[in-house]
Amino acid sequence: MDTNNNIEKEILALAKQKVSLIEYENYLSQIKYNPNASKSDIAFFYAPNKVLCTTITAKYGALLKEILSQNKVGMHLAHSVDVRIEVAPKIQINAQANINYKAIKTSVKDSYTFENFVVGSCNNTVYEIAKKVAQSDTPPYNPVLFYGGTGLGKTHILNAIGNHALEKHKKVVLVTSEDFLTDFLKHLDNKTMDSFKAKYRHCDFFLLDDAQFLQGKPKLEEEFFHTFNELHANSKQIVLISDRSPKNIAGLEDRLKSRFEWGITAKVMPPNLETKLSIVKQKCQLNQITLPEEVMEYIAQHISDNIRQMEGAIIKISVNANLMNAPIDLNLAKTVLEDLQKDHAEGSSLENILLAVAQSLNLKSSEIKVSSRQKNVALARKLVVYFARLYTPNPTLSLAQFLDLKDHSSISKMYSSVKKMLEEEKNPFILSLREEIKNRLNELNDKKTAFNSSE
């Protein structure tokens, strides 16, 4: 690969194959390649802070050395390549001066725009709401909350709003809940809360990613509550991203849940096959990778709905073809992507299946465990049975007890009902729901795997 940006992409793509998704997102995706300091036998990276610098060096330093030494990435051609990770230089902001929003706009990713967001039936409503919000001088809805599974484009749409607002010279703050917490604790410890409040309460657009992680942190929830109130009172636009609807964020204060629902809430659905193929083609273009049509169709059909995983599959095929000096064809794609097609939902617990179904249908787990005539609850109970039959060894008796069913024969009827709907393929909602539940199960199981591996 020619550019420094592509060298970084190639290194991270190879690293992503070696760790769980949650490890990659929390750690390795945070590092940046430093081409100016790097040489043929040593690679320098930046990490956002000292904690990440220490953690990544300890846990993944050897992995990065192995990748660079074995794959001869970019300019690193030595037999053994050393790796150094340093804390990235930070922009200093004077606590007494006005906040320089141009200096902190780097939190908005320039590459995520409305122009390169692939629109389909799964996300059209979200796209239209986001454009209206970004283009309006006063908030048309406030707050706006978009929710849905991982990798469906929520962060892209949040950054697109930020980029459009910056073009209009608006003051924009885009932050994750985790970074909001880190910043809050830092200013609290340094007794500089006036600077913290000036930064977050005096912007035109406050964009918060992973809002669900506010839960269970009383001091942070208290500060966010007052930040939200002041922004809302001053007609400043608030946009929130979450992996679930407000009522399903367990442990979040009721007063925050109610405020999240003041404006408009919209769900990002998993993409259908046509939209997935459009996404694959766009990602190929953005990464300057040429794939045969049949390979792009294969990726769309066999890789999960997670957009990041689709892009990872594209890069993985390209990297492996380069390393093996082989042409890209369908056989190569099948071989390279074999591990990505494994169904991580296998071996799910009943509790995870219940949680995945509940989140997908905006219900509480406790609601599903009790028999009800409400259509959405009845459907949820059938889906729990269906996925339990697919992914767990639990016998009929255990399933019946889990769902408080006295008639064990109901289990077979419930399973057959869902199976028939899916086989007939007449109900796009059910088909989409199946994929969403599978994605959520994959996420839950990946988190469990990452937790166990860290013990």
From Swiss-Prot:
Residues 107-321 are annotated as: Domain III, AAA+ region. It is found in: Cytoplasm. It holds the Pfam family Bac_DnaA_C. Transmembrane segments: none annotated. It comes from the Bacteria. Residues 75-106 are annotated as: Domain II. One of its GO terms (biological process) is DNA replication initiation. ATP binds at residues 151, 153-155. Residues 322-455 are annotated as: Domain IV, binds dsDNA. GO terms for molecular function: ATP binding; ATP hydrolysis activity; DNA replication origin binding; lipid binding. GO terms for cellular component: cytoplasm; plasma membrane. The keyword Nucleotide-binding applies. Its main location: cytoplasm. InterPro entries: AAA+_ATPase, Chromosome_initiator_DnaA, Chromosome_initiator_DnaA-like, Chromosome_initiator_DnaA_CS, DnaA_C, DnaA_dom, DnaA_N_sf, P-loop_NTPase. Keywords: ATP-binding, Cytoplasm, DNA replication, DNA-binding, Lipid-binding, Nucleotide-binding. Residues 1-75 are annotated as: Domain I, interacts with DnaA modulators. Domain I is involved in oligomerization and binding regulators, domain II is flexibile and of varying length in different bacteria, domain III forms the AAA+ region, while domain IV binds dsDNA. NCBIfam families: DnaA (TIGR00362). Plays an essential role in the initiation and regulation of chromosomal replication. ATP-DnaA binds to the origin of replication (oriC) to initiate formation of the DNA replication initiation complex once per cell cycle. Binds the DnaA box (a 9 base pair repeat at the origin) and separates the double-stranded (ds)DNA. Forms a right-handed helical filament on oriC DNA; dsDNA binds to the exterior of the filament while single-stranded (ss)DNA is stabiized in the filament's interior. Oligomerizes as a right-handed, spiral filament on DNA at oriC. Belongs to the DnaA family. HAMAP family: DnaA_bact. PANTHER family: CHROMOSOMAL REPLICATION INITIATOR PROTEIN DNAA. This is Chromosomal replication initiator protein DnaA. The lineage of its organism: Bacteria, Pseudomonadati, Campylobacterota, Epsilonproteobacteria, Campylobacterales.
